[in-house]
Amino acid sequence: MSDDNRVYIFDTTLRDGEQSPGATMTREEKVRMARQLETLGVDIIEAGFPAASEGDFQAVSAIAAAVKTPVVAALCRALASDIDRGFEAIKGAQRRRIHTFLATSELHMQHKLNKTPTQVLDMIEAAVSHAASKGVEVQFSAEDASRSEPAFLVAACERAINAGATILNIPDTVGYAQPAEFAELIRHLMTTVRGAGGVTFAVHCHNDLGLAVANTLAALHAGARQAEVTLSGIGERAGNASLEQVVMGLNTRPNYYNLTTGIVTEELFPSCRRLSGIIGQPIPPYAPIMGRNAFAHESGIHQHGVLKDRRTYEIMTAESIGRKGAVVVLGKHSGRHALDAKVKELGYALNDEELLVVFVAVKQLADRKQRILDEDIEALILEKVLRRPDRYALQFLSVHCGNVELAPFAVVEMQVEGQTVRHYSAGSGPVDAVFNAVCQAVGRKPDLEEYQINAITGGTDAQGEVTVRIKDGTATTVGRGVHDDVIMASTLAFINALNRLAKKEEERTCPQL
């Protein structure tokens, strides 16, 4: 298959994906995800928006230094100062790209930019030319392209090409496009824009109408060769096109698309699990490809067919996306070498000290649980090793509840910014009592917007995974806690969310595409 059939995967999980409410990541977490994206085989990592804040600049710089194979892209507004800042952030990368953008729809030009079409074209030329002078790849995105006048969009693309852009991105910024018309728009641009033969056309689709993946695949079928996607489809509002769905859409229909990617599909599930653990947002059970129901069959007719031949109701294998679900024979008498091998198989690189921490946790869990599964080990790694340093830490918890007239109450002892504090509080139930006591200890009272419990594995001795979403003012964060005691898991999740809230970087204006 020729290079003309190669689709380049541009992952924007660390930039657009992070704009999903509650999905904020620290610099260290972004670096960990970037390394996993490199293992996954993505071609381009959009590391962030360096001009937004010093924290974003430092994160992009750290990612640029950490990965070797992917191109590292910095998002910049069509401003020389943004482009200079972006270049400084990625200059340590082995392969670099400046991604600059400007809106081209009448709505955006008039009401957001307050610019005339002529002024916008001049800004595109100036920004792309300035970026090209840095000696790096230059990508231009026409924000809100799907609602732009086609003739003006052609003019904007031509101005960008003449100024030095080699990648033209056509975003469906608000998820407005329909697959057939979006494909036609791509074909129109590729046949009408002067110089189109020398550039790569890309698409960046949002999911407001649930069509992000369909629009992306339609555009690729029409000739676009770069797909801008995120793991699990996380992103602004209803999210972005899902990386795993786009890739497996191409993989399962080779005779239709005749397109390939460089993605190692066996790393898809580990990558989505890794992201889920970092941002504290569980993968929905009904999520295509990644959800726990994706390879489950309840109907008797379906079960009969699958038992005869899995291809009757499965269009891909669980193994092809890295879902193994194997039982790990680890327990009280297992050694560190066995654990080390399993940790590496799961895709984690732990030093001796970190491995010891997980080993002790596995031993403790084995005292309470008969079988230790892959999911258990990964949950312990995320909980014990990869959790961000905490401003608030739980030291002691006691909860009383029952069917007596005494209201449920909780006693917590915590480290709060280096000081030990102890508080008692009652509540309408044990979880409410714990949350009230924790709030008193840390001195803040956020609103609890969401509370979810999931069993990581089956059985009455399964570890419970609790996810909470809290809001304090305009700031929203998600926390995650894992324990075989649901009350303890709930407490850990709430404290994790409070830590994320406390460490959230200064508010910044996030760009749209």
Curated annotation (Swiss-Prot):
Known function: Catalyzes the condensation of the acetyl group of acetyl-CoA with 3-methyl-2-oxobutanoate (2-ketoisovalerate) to form 3-carboxy-3-hydroxy-4-methylpentanoate (2-isopropylmalate).
One cellular-component annotation, GO: cytoplasm
Subunit structure: Homodimer.
SUPFAM superfamilies noted in UniProt: 2-isopropylmalate synthase LeuA, allosteric (dimerisation) domain, Aldolase
Reaction catalysed by this enzyme: 3-methyl-2-oxobutanoate + acetyl-CoA + H2O = (2S)-2-isopropylmalate + CoA + H(+)
Region (Regulatory domain): 393-513
GO biological process assignments: L-leucine biosynthetic process
SMART domains, alphabetized: LeuA_dimer
A UniProt-annotated Pfam family: HCS_D2
Localization in the cell: Cytoplasm
Key words of the record: Amino-acid biosynthesis, Branched-chain amino acid biosynthesis, Cytoplasm, Leucine biosynthesis, Manganese, Metal-binding, Transferase
GO molecular function, one term: acetyl-CoA C-acetyltransferase activity
Organism field: Solidesulfovibrio magneticus (strain ATCC 700980 / DSM 13731 / RS-1) (Desulfovibrio magneticus)
Named cofactor requirement(s): Mn(2+)
Primary subcellular site in the record, as a coarse category: cytoplasm
Superkingdom of origin organism: Bacteria
Pathway per the UniProt entry: Amino-acid biosynthesis; L-leucine biosynthesis; L-leucine from 3-methyl-2-oxobutanoate: step 1/4
Record-annotated Pyruvate carboxyltransferase domain positions: 7-269
EC number: 2.3.3.13
PANTHER family: 2-ISOPROPYLMALATE SYNTHASE 1, CHLOROPLASTIC-RELATED (PTHR10277:SF9), HOMOCITRATE SYNTHASE-RELATED (PTHR10277)
Signal peptide: none
Designated name of the protein: 2-isopropylmalate synthase
